[in-house]
Amino acid sequence: VTAPSAEKKTGSFERRIYMNNSAAFKCIECGREHHVGEVEYVCASCGGNLDVLYDYGRVRKQLSREGLATDGNFTMWRYRPLLPVEDSSPVPPLTVGWTPIYTCSQLAGRLGIKEVFIKDDGRNPTASFKDRPSALAVVKAREAGARIITTASSGNAGSALAGMCASVGMRSIIFVPAYAPAAKVAQLQIYGSTVVIVEGSYDQAYDLCIEASRRFGWYQRSTGYNPYTREGKKTAAFEIAEQLDWDAPDKVFVAVGDGNIMSGLWKGFNDLYRIGFIDRLPQMIGVQSETASAIVDAANGDGFVREGPAHTIADSINVGRPRDATAAVRAIRESGGCGVEVSDEQILAAIPALARETGVFAEPAAAAAYAGFLKLCQAGSLKHDDRVLVMVTGNGLKDIDSARRSVK
């Protein structure tokens, strides 16, 4: 995987014009374009991840900042013209998105930074960011006439999918590694999912899930395989911009596992830039555990992603073979951002630190983003006039054992 040497402030996502808002894909790896009906998940030529292409001229006619200002639909679906769903498609009834952004003036003053914002996606229905892509995946599965939908997950993606499926009466089958936190597995079972415990890593659970979906014809939601997960995740970027009065932050800190949240946020900001809703793009700062750092190493190094073992307390980013690595590395490098590695000790320390400074209770992976933010602050790498946003992707009750360890 090679990160491009493209200009810093323009996205790598293709901007071709098509008859419908979203009518084609482009492979992120080899560049081949596909019509929507031509492929279902990945590139037919190289197996690479696909990017959804939009007709931005058409979007501009359907979506405006003024229209959003009077729109009472405070969910991710308020941005429907920038989502790849049919106009007539019903969406899950759970309220996904429009999670709060907190302005942390006291924290900013103490750290000597202009503004610090916390976006708390732990406030979503199943308590994580992953409700966004799972809600969209359920819509696409129903459009395809699927009855069963599956995903591989360390917990949050599975919980999100299970909750969305329960809300519309669909069956879900979730593949999870044996080390997944008990609270997350319990959440799957509460929602009525069929849970397949894999005695192995997340990467092994992922491969088994893909093989099972091919064999049995289940609809596949897994990150870095289903191209629509990125589209659901980008809605957080739309909200960040709108909630900050269309003045994008200078830097966005986000924890990175497979890389799909990173690539989704970057695409979302680029979408808004393309339709003239924002006039500048933020720098994307990816944070990983030092024991699961394939994307950070590539972004800060030669651009090549090298797989390796992953062993971190932050289960949601415990990934040795990131499935959306190319797009994530590009997002960091094109935005002029960087990668940050943090230790498990720093991640654990960030859980109570974030809670005591802001009142936001984060699971380990979400706290990793805050740990990365603190690390750059302490290193003097942030400017006094920076406006910084930290993306909190999951609630601390998702992994209560780690929370207990963090305060011992």
PLM regions and their residue ranges:
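Short amphipathic, helix-prone segments within low-complexity/disordered or flexible regions
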Residues: A3-E7
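Short, Lys/Arg-enriched N-terminal segments with co-localized hydrophobic residues
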Residues: K8-Y18
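PLP-dependent amino-acid enzyme catalytic core
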Residues: Y18-K408
